[in-house]
Amino acid sequence: MIDSDFIKNSKIVIQNVSRETLEELKNYSLSIIKKNKEINLISSSTEKSINTRHIADSAQTIDFINKNDIKVCTDLGTGAGLPGIVLAILMKPKKPEFKVILYEKSHHKSNFLKEISKKFKLNTEINQKNIFEQKNLQTDIIISRAFKPVPVIFEIASRNFKKFKYIILFLGKSGKEILKEASKKWKFDYEEKKSLTSDQSLIVKISNLQKKKK
């Protein structure tokens, strides 16, 4: 069962999180586990730790969202809806107009996301499309978790989006080295915070992304 402890260190999430919201997160995690028997949403080895490994890990990204000027978040290759659905659930009572756009090319996973969105009455848009084929997209936040390497995410942001404010990424223990390597081809600013669910991981917010001229 999920309780308030699983987000106790997230400074924004912990403020006024209703019992109803926590219950929705719990039901969402149970839905993932149930559906995981039919389609591969998450690794079966992480089912027992889904609250921390997936739900809380996704929830902590809300610390990087400025709720006053952020209206749209786009989740690339969302899979089971992590972190997009978690953010939609958390933001629903705080800012109902906050919209999460989720890209997932799998038919079965997209249908699961639609069922979840309908069940919890979430402000989402589910796109069963290949993000690499989309052009002139607009959003406030681009977010990606366990989808593609950082250089690929940067290329998608640069080529497929004509407008965005920043990118939120989940990085592992080599995150600093990955950003350093990316800086050889890209100019960007970033803020980082240590992951609340893994001592070796980082959550980073990338802004002012520009490709360096050769």
What are these regions (language model features)?
Residues 1-68, 74, 108-122:
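Class I SAM-dependent transferase core
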Residues 59-143:
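Conserved SAM/SAH cofactor-binding pocket of Class I
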Residues 154-167:
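A short glycine-rich, Lys/Arg-flanked "PGG" loop and its adjoining helix->strand segment in the class I
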Residues 146-147:
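Short glycine-/small-residue-rich Rossmann-like dinucleotide-binding loops
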Residues 105, 170-174:
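Short strand-turn motif at the edge of the Rossmann-like AdoMet-binding core
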Residues 174-214:
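Active-site capping/gating segments
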Residues 99, 123-125, 166, 187-191:
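Conserved beta-strand segments of alpha/beta enzyme cores
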Residues 32, 170-171, 206:
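Residue-level signal for inorganic ion chemistry
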